[in-house]
Amino acid sequence: MISADTNVFVYLFDPRDSSKNETAKTVVAAMRTRQSSVGLQVVGEIQSALRRRLRLPVGLATQQARDVLTQFSTFAYGESAVETALAEAGAERLSYWDALLLAAADAVGVKAMISEDMGDGRRFRGLEVINPFGPSGPSDRVIRLLGL
């Protein structure tokens, strides 16, 4: 199973970097045709990031987050994911929120987390982080993962 971090979805609506915008569109479209799931945490972060970073109107930001919610299966975090996130953050290996997302994703069988900022190639238990952005389009690793 494949999942993606908030930043991939935010780039869908960010015209300032056309290469990342196009890559995000390609990645999300491919995810829709494969066994993919999105963390409920990510859905909330999408709404917040679209409001804060891109200054989208609240109604539009909320609708974009809701669209992700309805287009993908979702997963949530439980107590064990919180414990893992606290341990990872306490050891300064990851931010609490990144660790929480990875722990929750791992618990439901996600094998690849597509993310720009969690460290390309990082292994976290049973999953691997893959940066989708290459120098001029999708990275080689995301191309292989998604069969692009």
For each of these PLM feature ranges, what is it?
Residues V8, V42, A81, L100-L101, ...:
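Alpha-helix capping/helix-boundary segments
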